[in-house]
């Protein structure tokens, strides 16, 4: 038994090391790749200082943090709701951020700065989160709380559709492209949003013990002495914050929060002590690679990164499911 535990521990360490190397390689490739390839030796030349340090580095850091946040959010939701299909957009938090953003564009008549739009997106996500917490205080079951989140997401999606359909604003139509996900407008002015993600990411990665209890189910978690109501509220709030900041940075991006945790579980990473940091590394790597494809696929334009993640990720996910079933 002890030998099996040690073998599993060594395997987990190898997985984390491999994911760390993959993320580092993806990060370096993201800094080098673009309309102009800039090798490591040219990073400190005048051309490298402009393209690498001023343009590509803030975008790369944003992609890394958003990928980690979305993947961890997916892992938290899948444990919290005992549903492998749970993901950050399921509770309506992403759509709530979109409603906040569209309201800011309409009320500000397209004149608000980017930082104000970001704050409105976060506010929209947090409002949906507060509504969910209100439902949670009524001690609803996990399945009913999940259904409440789905209903809120549908309402927010309808509000966005009505607002965009009846709008003649060019900015609002461009906002539809932004809601498909993209990092084209990210620079150092959005560094405050990146910093807002880091403490929550680190805190959740340290909560493996309650996460492991939640993954056992509500009844088992209560029997083990876990204050279920408290942890459900805290984790929903933390997830709402991460998703709101991510949408403010890059728009709505699918696939990462749904598939990355599921893929890692299929690979044998079920303990949240390994799964949470593994999701952060794998989510960051996957989104970095998707962002590189989005930048380089077309010569004169940039693809929405949400389209890239779905196109590349869905076949891999189906293949892994078929392989696991065998």
Swiss-Prot record:
SUPFAM superfamilies given in the database record: ABC transporter involved in vitamin B12 uptake, BtuC
Positions of transmembrane segments: 15-35, 61-81, 88-108, 112-132, 146-166, 184-204, 240-260, 274-294, 302-322
Record-level Gene Ontology MF annotations: vitamin transmembrane transporter activity
Presence of keyword Transferase: no
A Gene Ontology cellular-component term: plasma membrane
Pfam families: FecCD
Stretches assigned to coiled coil: none
Keywords: Cell inner membrane, Cell membrane, Membrane, Transmembrane, Transmembrane helix, Transport
Topological relation to the membrane, as annotated: Multi-pass membrane protein
Cited function: Part of the ABC transporter complex BtuCDF involved in vitamin B12 import. Involved in the translocation of the substrate across the membrane.
Quaternary structure, from the entry: The complex is composed of two ATP-binding proteins (BtuD), two transmembrane proteins (BtuC) and a solute-binding protein (BtuF).
Similarity section: Belongs to the binding-protein-dependent transport system permease family. FecCD subfamily.
Protein name: Vitamin B12 import system permease protein BtuC
Lineage: Bacteria, Pseudomonadati, Pseudomonadota, Gammaproteobacteria, Enterobacterales
Gene expressing this chain: btuC
């Amino acid at each position: 038994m002890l030998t099996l535990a040690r073998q599993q521990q060594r395997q987990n360490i190898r997985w984390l090391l491999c994911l760390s190397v993959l993320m580092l390689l993806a990060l370096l490739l993201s800094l080098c790749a673009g309309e102009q390839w800039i090798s490591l030796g040219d990073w400190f030349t005048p051309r490298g200082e402009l393209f690498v340090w001023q343009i590509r580095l803030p975008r790369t850091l944003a992609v890394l943090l958003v990928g980690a946040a979305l993947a961890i959010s997916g892992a938290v939701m899948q444990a919290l709701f005992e549903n492998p299909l749970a993901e950050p957009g399921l509770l309506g938090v992403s759509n709530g951020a979109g409603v906040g953003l569209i309201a800011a564009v309409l009320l500000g008549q397209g004149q608000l700065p980017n930082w104000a739009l970001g704050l409105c997106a976060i506010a929209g996500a947090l409002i949906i989160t507060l509504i969910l917490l209100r439902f949670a205080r009524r001690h609803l079951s996990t399945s009913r709380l999940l259904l409440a989140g789905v209903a809120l997401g549908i309402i927010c999606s309808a509000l966005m559709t009505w607002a965009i359909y009846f709008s003649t604003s060019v900015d609002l139509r461009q906002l539809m492209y932004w809601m498909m996900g993209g990092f084209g407008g990210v620079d150092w002015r959005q560094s405050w949003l990146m910093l807002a993600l880091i403490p929550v990411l680190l805190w959740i990665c340290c909560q493996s013990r309650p996460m492991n209890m939640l993954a056992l189910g509500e009844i088992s978690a209560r029997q083990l002495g876990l204050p279920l109501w408290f942890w459900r509220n805290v984790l929903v709030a933390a997830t709402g914050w991460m998703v709101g900041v991510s949408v403010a940075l890059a728009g709505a991006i699918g696939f990462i929060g749904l598939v990355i945790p599921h893929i890692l579980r299929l690979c044998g990473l079920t303990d949240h002590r390994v799964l949470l940091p593994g999701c952060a590394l794998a989510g960051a790597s996957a989104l970095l690679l998707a962002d590189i494809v989005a930048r380089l696929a077309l010569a004169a334009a940039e693809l929405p990164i949400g389209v890239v993640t779905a196109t590349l990720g869905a076949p891999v996910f189906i293949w892994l499911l078929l392989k696991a079933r065998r």
